[in-house]
């Protein structure tokens, strides 16, 4: 069932973050109903016919302050997906026999990086993702139930995520709905993409769903940049240093450049340089970006869009760099736009240093 048609019941453990979580779920297309943990019964939830149940964050201890939350987990296991956030995860931990105790530190609105298993909520989420924490309690490793597996941890070993090995039940200790959490929207999308009561059942359903080309490119570019961002001399800090040293070429305003053509009674043409596409295959595998850019500039175009994605479009960031150099001496040169599947600040910084005046952002890829 598509995320847009998922009916979600959220149990509110009297926490203000419940409504941030509500907003994220709604933004991803879910229909969400929220009920306080002492103001609804299991039969009433059954009557609502939810596709997913979410257990919210909350103050206190899951054993004493979570109301109906643990009963909800017990009742709906093996029937529909159940996801928990912060106290919601602690409820999962305790319901299956684990202990939630003092975590050894108190954190309130602080970020930590976590490593994860790239499954469930963490599918396609980069490693060392920064997440926001508000807690002093956590599930203990020594009491981890045999039926649960750890999905994420901080650098100092605190459990940040658990998943049931059989049932579609998963939780995280941090807050994906916090603005400081990286890839929070992707995590929420992943929640809503789960169906059925068992992971095995869900895996079969997921296998039947055809992955979109955008999803394929997105996943591949994440892998590409995990490598690229760790190359010596190409790390984020390196690019920031280059920018501070004034190594980025001067830029022109994209909108002003379009307006120049329009004000002069000309068509503001946005031209494009690409060697291939997913739909057309190879268009011109030998296309020279510098030569093509100069031809476009001489023809009076307002903007030159340069595809820099290597796998499906056969481009690269060097294409943009040489295209910019080729037109720098042209009077009233066109604007250079990087057309790419952009999902992080590194790619924007990289584009700027290569000579881009602006970049294309695909809203569906942003979180």
From Swiss-Prot:
E.C. designation(s): 4.1.3.27, 4.1.1.48
Any GO BP annotation: L-tryptophan biosynthetic process
Molecular function per GO: anthranilate synthase activity; indole-3-glycerol-phosphate synthase activity
Highest taxon above the source species: Eukaryota
Active site residues per record: 86, 175, 177
Catalytic activity: chorismate + L-glutamine = anthranilate + pyruvate + L-glutamate + H(+); 1-(2-carboxyphenylamino)-1-deoxy-D-ribulose 5-phosphate + H(+) = (1S,2R)-1-C-(indol-3-yl)glycerol 3-phosphate + CO2 + H2O
InterPro entries: Aldolase_TIM, Anth_synth/Amidotransfase, Class_I_gatase-like, GATASE, Indole-3-glycerol_P_synth_dom, Indole-3-GlycerolPSynthase_CS, RibuloseP-bd_barrel, TrpG/PapA_dom
Glutamine amidotransferase type-1 domain: residues covered: 7-201
Database matches in Gene3D superfamilies: 3.40.50.880, Aldolase class I (3.20.20.70)
Pathway: Amino-acid biosynthesis; L-tryptophan biosynthesis; L-tryptophan from chorismate: step 1/5; Amino-acid biosynthesis; L-tryptophan biosynthesis; L-tryptophan from chorismate: step 4/5
One Pfam family per UniProt: IGPS
Protein residues bound to L-glutamine: 58-60, 90, 136-137
Annotated region (Indole-3-glycerol phosphate synthase), positions in chain: 209-367
Cellular component per GO, a single term: cytosol
Keywords: Amino-acid biosynthesis, Aromatic amino acid biosynthesis, Glutamine amidotransferase, Lyase, Multifunctional enzyme, Tryptophan biosynthesis
Additional comment: Component I catalyzes the formation of anthranilate using ammonia rather than glutamine, whereas component II provides glutamine amidotransferase activity.
PANTHER family reported in the protein's UniProt record: MULTIFUNCTIONAL TRYPTOPHAN BIOSYNTHESIS PROTEIN, MULTIFUNCTIONAL TRYPTOPHAN BIOSYNTHESIS PROTEIN-RELATED
Assembly: Tetramer of two components I and two components II.
Protein's recorded name: Multifunctional tryptophan biosynthesis protein
